[in-house]
Each structure stands twice: as C-alpha cells, then as structure tokens.
C-alpha cells in the first residue's frame, strides 16, 4: 500500500517518465503558439509559489510524474533549469533520496494544505497514495485563479476557445 509524502525538493533526475504531452515539442500547437508554459511561469512568479507535482513511484526504476503538474514540471525544467521541485509523492517506501523535510500526509486537509487555496484540486483522494486532478478550466475559473496580467488572461482565453 502506498503512502503520500510531501517532498519539498524532489530530485528531477529521479523521474523516469515525465508525463509530458507531445504538444510541448510542437511549435504550431495552440498551447505552444499561445505560450501556455509562459503563462504557468508568470502565474508562479506572481503567486510566489509552486504547487506540487504529482509523482507515483512503482519502484526505483519506475518514477512517474503526473498526471497533475506535468506542464509545470516541463516549464520549470526546460525553461528555468530547475533540478529539484516540490512534489507530492505516492510510494510504498520513503526513500533516503527524497531529501530533508519530507512530511507524510495522512489526511485530506494535510494534502490540500500544499495547494494554493484559490485553486484547490477539483477531485482528490488519499487511497493508496495521493491523487488529484485540477480539471479543465472554464473562463470563470481562469479569471478567478490565474495570477497573471490581463494580456496573458486574454491569450489563455483565446487558446481555450481554439482548443475546446
């Protein structure tokens, strides 16, 4: 049975499956054209926080990111050259390489405390580790939750219109 852990400085080089979507490498994809990753980074900069990436560890050779947070992971590693990120890890073992200040998560209140209170996950569970899903944004959620400039909000709305 997996437990959930908050790992404030998870080593990215331990991730064997980053979960990134193919669009990250397609310059003509709407998310690329409208600079979705830039909007994510702008939001993190303005919020002065990075919400955790979801990690599931099956064994030390199978460390999977996602589904929640894979765009954040891609933006932080490829545009900001991060080597460690905050994660919520589901694993049967608390590995030494998780580093310092690891916190075992026992309740949904503890799980939700690691997220921006203005944009809590739409669904979540602590059954056999931690799972959450942010879900697809609506225009109203975008307005309420994205801490970005009006120009970026407009760009993201245009992207949503094109992709929905």
Predicted features along the sequence, with ranges:
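General helical structural elements
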Residues: 18, 37, 76, 148, ...
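A short, basic-hydrophobic beta/loop patch
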Residues: 49-111
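Amphipathic, charge-rich alpha-helical segments that serve as recognition/docking helices
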Residues: 90-164
